């Protein structure tokens, strides 16, 4: 199925951003081989030259390395991958803050809203960990 593109930015830049998201999320793990230009172009529904341009941009940024006869591989540079994840998360958070401020929310209200949304997951995780601890503790008591 072809990737979705919009008319607001050049397609090759949209491809770069999609591939960066896939790298940051681990869909393309560090050191993994990327599909060929032709295969990626078919998957995305774009001209191979457009895909080549996007991949060249990723090579220039250091996220992808080209090995002459073996293909292209995702970098294993942990710092580069952390920088990518941080810059992408910073951009997402900045956009979120701008949208929430646009709704008239103060920074304090934004922080509280985010805390409320994160808290249920944290509480659920703590409950799960406590349940596991209790089960292990009970098993240990039964053995003694």
Segments predicted by a language model, with ranges:
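Short hinge/loop at the helix->beta-strand junction immediately C-terminal to the helix-turn-helix recognition helix
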Residues: 27-28, 57, 62-63
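Short, Lys/Arg-rich nucleic-acid/phosphate-binding segment
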Residues: 34, 66-74, 78
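Extreme N-terminal segment that seeds HTH/winged-HTH DNA-binding domains in transcriptional regulators
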Residues: 1-33, 39, 87, 91, ...
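Short Asp/Glu-rich motifs
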Residues: 41-42, 77-78, 119
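A short alpha-helical element within helix-turn-helix/winged-helix DNA-binding domains
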Residues: 33-44, 58
């Amino acid at each position: 199925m072809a990737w979705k593109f919009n008319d607001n930015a050049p397609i090759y830049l949209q491809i770069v951003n999609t591939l960066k998201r896939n790298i940051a999320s681990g869909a393309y793990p560090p050191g993994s081989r990327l599909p060929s230009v032709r295969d990626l172009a078919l998957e995305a529904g774009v001209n191979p030259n457009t895909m080549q341009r996007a991949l060249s941009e990723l090579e220039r940024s250091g996220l992808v390395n080209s090995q002459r006869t073996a293909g292209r591989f995702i970098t294993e540079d942990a710092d580069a991958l952390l920088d990518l994840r941080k810059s992408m998360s910073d951009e997402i958070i900045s956009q979120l803050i701008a949208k929430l401020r646009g709704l008239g929310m103060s920074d304090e209200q934004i922080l509280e809203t985010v805390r409320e949304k994160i808290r249920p997951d944290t509480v659920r995780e703590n409950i799960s960990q406590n349940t596991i601890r209790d089960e292990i503790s009970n098993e240990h008591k039964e053995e003694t």
